[in-house]
Amino acid sequence: MKADILQHKLVPEHTILSEEEAQKVLDDLNVRLDQIPKILPTDPVVKAIDAKVGDILKITRKSETAGIFVAYRVVRD
């Protein structure tokens, strides 16, 4: 029996951005793709959501101090 890691309370929501959404994030943050922090293709959540190398993930987590915190990661080695 496998556990669904996406349902664990400590795993924040991960969303794969479309190409249009990814370009908007890069433009809004005024950064290049290689300036976005990485997440490895071997990460369990990356595997669970079937993200591919080059995808940008939006990670949304709840924070007691910030309310909701959004981070972006690009899948790469």
From Swiss-Prot:
GO MF annotation terms: DNA binding; DNA-directed RNA polymerase activity
Superkingdom field: Archaea
Enzymatic reactions: RNA(n) + a ribonucleoside 5'-triphosphate = RNA(n+1) + diphosphate
Its EC number(s): 2.7.7.6
First-listed, main subcellular location of the protein, grouped into a coarse class: cytoplasm
InterPro entries, A to Z: Arch_Rpo5/euc_Rpb5 (IPR014381), RNA_pol_subH/Rpb5_C (IPR000783), RPB5-like_sf (IPR035913)
Xref: Pfam families: RNA_pol_Rpb5_C
Extent of the signal sequence: none
Record-level GO BP terms: transcription by RNA polymerase II; transcription elongation by RNA polymerase I; tRNA transcription by RNA polymerase III
UniProt keyword list: Cytoplasm, DNA-directed RNA polymerase, Nucleotidyltransferase, Transcription, Transferase
Enzyme class, broadest EC rank: transferase
Cellular component annotations (GO), alphabetically ordered: cytoplasm; DNA-directed RNA polymerase complex
HAMAP family: RNApol_Rpo5_RPB5 (MF_00025)
NCBIfam families (UniProt xref): PRK09570.1
Known role: DNA-dependent RNA polymerase (RNAP) catalyzes the transcription of DNA into RNA using the four ribonucleoside triphosphates as substrates.
Family: Belongs to the archaeal Rpo5/eukaryotic RPB5 RNA polymerase subunit family.
Quaternary structure and partners: Part of the RNA polymerase complex.
PANTHER family listed in its UniProt record: DNA-DIRECTED RNA POLYMERASES I, II, AND III SUBUNIT RPABC1
Name recorded for this polypeptide: DNA-directed RNA polymerase subunit Rpo5
Gene name for this UniProt entry: rpo5
